[in-house]
From Swiss-Prot:
Recorded name of the encoding gene: qseC
Matches recorded under SUPFAM superfamilies: ATPase domain of HSP90 chaperone/DNA topoisomerase II/histidine kinase (SSF55874), Homodimeric domain of signal transducing histidine kinase (SSF47384)
Annotated organism of origin: Salmonella typhi
Protein name stated in the entry: Sensor protein QseC
EC class (word): transferase
Keywords: ATP-binding, Cell inner membrane, Cell membrane, Kinase, Membrane, Nucleotide-binding, Phosphoprotein, Transferase, Transmembrane, Transmembrane helix, Two-component regulatory system
Length: 449
C-alpha cells in the first residue's frame, strides 16, 4: 500500500497545500527575480547614462590637473559610501587615462570600440562589470562609467526578498489556519463515522447529512439507500423464515404421521402402500410449498429486472397453453386460447412472465370442476384467464392474492402463494392484476398494462 493511502485526509490536504504553496512561492520568486533584475538593470543603465553625460559637460581641458584625482569623492548610496556603486574614468583619444574616481576607476582598462554599453573586467579582477562608453562633444575624450554586476544582482535580490519574505513568514500562520479549518470542516465526518460505529445492524434510521460537505453528501445518501435495502431484505428474510416455519409445520407433521402409519402397517401391504402413496403426495406438496416460498422470496428481493427482452405475448400464451395441456387433459378440462389481437409485444423477463401465466392456468385448472373449460383471451392491452367454475364469494374476493390465503372449505390442496407470485411478477413488469367473477359465470383474472 502506498504511503499516501495510509495517511489521513487532513494530512493529505495539508501536504498538498504545502506543496502547492511551495511551488507557487518558488515560481513567484523566480518571476519576481527576473522582472526585478530587468527593472534594476534598466534603472542603473539609465543612471550610468546620466552620470556619463554629466561628466561630458565638464571642462575637459582642465583634466590634466593631478589634484582632481586625489580629491575625487566616492559615490554615496543610501547615505553610506559604497565602492561598488559607480566608477568612472576619462581617457584621451589615444587611450591615456586623464581622470578617474580615485578608486575602481583607475583599474578600468581602455578597450573602447564604440559608444554604448559593454561588459568587461577591471585590471587584475575577475568580477564582471557593466560599462558605458561615451565620446565628448569634440571627440577628444573617451568617458567610461562602470558598475559591478554583483552589485546589481544584490540589489535585485534584496528587493525580491523584501517582497517575498512576508509571505514566507505568513506560511506557518496560513498552515495553522488551514488545520483549524480542516478540523472544523471534517467534524461532521467524524460524527458520521461515530454514528456508523454505534449503529445497530437492524436500524433503518437514515444518517443525518446535516453539515456534511456537498462532495460527501452523495455518499451519505447512498448509505441511507443501502441501509433501507438491507432493512427491507432483513424484513423479507424474517418473514420468509416465519412463513416457512408456519406453513411447513402442518405438512411435516402429516409426513410424520404417514411415516408412522407405514411403520405400523406391519404385514398389511395395502395399508403400507396407501400410507406410502400419501407420504409421496405429502412430499410433493411440501416440495411445491418450498419452491413457491423461495420463488416469492426471490421476487421480493428484486427491484429491477435483468435479462429483459421483447416478448410476443401471443407466443407466450400459446407456449403456456401447450405446457398445461397434459395436466388439463388428465383433469378432464379443456383449455382454449382466443387471440383478439396480434403482434402484442411487451418488454419483460421471459421466465417470470411464463411463470405468471403458468400460475394463472394452474390455479384455474385446480379449482375448476371436471368437464369445464378454461378460456385464455389476448387483447391489445390485456389478457384474461377465465374458468366456468362456481366463482368466488364477494367477501372472499378482497383476500384473493394475499399470501397463504386459501378460501375456507376448499378440498383442493395448495399453499395460497400462487396468485401472490402472479401479483408480484405483474408489479415488477409495470402491470396490474385484478381478480373477480366473470359476467358469464366463473372466476377470472385480468392482467393489464
Amino acid at each position: 500500500m502506498k504511503l499516501t493511502q495510509r495517511l489521513s485526509l487532513r494530512v493529505r490536504l495539508t501536504l498538498i497545500f504545502l506543496i502547492l504553496v511551495s511551488i507557487t512561492w518558488a515560481i513567484s520568486s523566480f518571476v519576481a527575480w527576473r522582472k526585478t533584475t530587468d527593472n534594476v538593470d534598466e534603472l542603473f543603465d539609465t543612471q550610468l547614462m546620466l552620470f556619463a553625460r554629466r561628466l561630458s559637460t565638464l571642462d575637459l581641458n582642465e583634466l590634466n590637473a593631478p589634484q582632481r584625482m586625489a580629491h575625487t569623492p566616492k559615490k554615496l548610496k543610501h547615505g553610506h559610501i559604497d565602492d561598488d556603486a559607480l566608477a568612472f574614468a576619462i581617457f584621451s583619444a589615444d587611450g591615456k587615462m586623464l581622470l578617474h574616481d580615485g578608486d575602481n576607476g583607475q583599474d578600468i582598462p581602455y578597450r573602447y570600440r564604440r559608444e554604448g554599453f559593454d561588459n568587461g573586467y577591471l585590471k587584475d579582477d575577475n568580477d564582471l562589470w557593466r560599462f558605458l562608453w561615451l565620446n565628448s562633444a569634440d571627440g577628444k575624450y573617451r568617458i567610461v562609467v562602470g558598475q559591478e554586476w554583483d552589485y546589481r544582482e544584490d540589489m535585485a535580490l534584496a528587493i525580491v526578498a523584501a517582497q517575498l519574505t512576508p509571505w514566507l513568514i505568513a506560511l506557518p500562520f496560513m498552515l495553522l489556519i488551514l488545520l483549524l479549518l480542516l478540523h472544523r470542516e471534517l467534524r461532521p465526518l467524524k460524527k458520521l463515522a461515530q454514528a456508523l460505529r454505534f449503529r445497530s445492524p437492524e436500524s433503518e434510521t437514515p444518517l443525518d447529512a446535516k453539515g456534511v460537505p456537498s462532495e460527501v453528501r452523495p455518499l451519505v445518501e447512498a448509505l441511507n439507500q443501502l441501509f433501507s435495502r438491507i432493512h427491507s431484505m432483513m424484513v423479507r428474510e424474517r418473514r420468509f423464515t416465519s412463513d416457512a416455519a408456519h406453513e411447513l409445520r402442518s405438512p411435516l407433521a402429516a409426513l410424520k404421521v404417514q411415516t408412522e402409519v407405514a411403520q405400523l402397517s406391519g404385514d398389511d401391504p395395502l395399508s403400507r402402500d396407501k400410507a406410502l402413496t400419501q407420504l409421496h403426495a405429502g412430499i410433493d406438496r411440501a416440495t411445491r410449498l418450498v419452491d413457491q416460498l423461495l420463488t416469492l422470496s426471490r421476487l421480493d428481493s428484486l427491484n429491477n429486472l435483468q435479462d429483459v427482452a421483447e416478448i410476443s405475448l401471443e407466443e407466450l400464451l400459446q407456449s403456456a397453453v401447450m405446457d398445461i395441456y397434459h395436466p388439463a387433459q388428465q383433469a378432464n378440462i379443456d383449455v382454449r386460447l382466443q387471440l383478439n389481437a396480434h403482434d402484442v409485444i411487451r418488454t419483460g423477463q421471459p421466465l417470470l412472465l411464463s411463470l405468471l401465466v403458468r400460475n394463472l392456468l394452474d390455479n384455474a385448472i385446480r379449482y375448476s370442476p371436471q368437464g369445464s373449460v378454461v378460456d385464455v383471451t389476448l387483447h391489445a392491452r390485456s389478457f384474461t384467464v377465465r374458468d366456468n367454475g362456481p366463482g368466488v364469494a364477494p367477501e372472499i374476493l378482497t383476500h384473493i392474492g394475499e399470501r397463504f390465503y386459501r378460501p375456507p372449505g376448499q378440498s383442493v390442496t395448495g399453499s395460497g402463494l400462487g396468485l401472490s407470485i402472479v401479483r408480484r411478477i405483474a408489479t415488477l413488469h409495470g402491470m396490474t392484476v385484478s381478480f373477480g367473477n366473470a359476467a358469464e359465470g366463473g372466476f377470472e383474472a385480468v392482467v393489464r398494462w
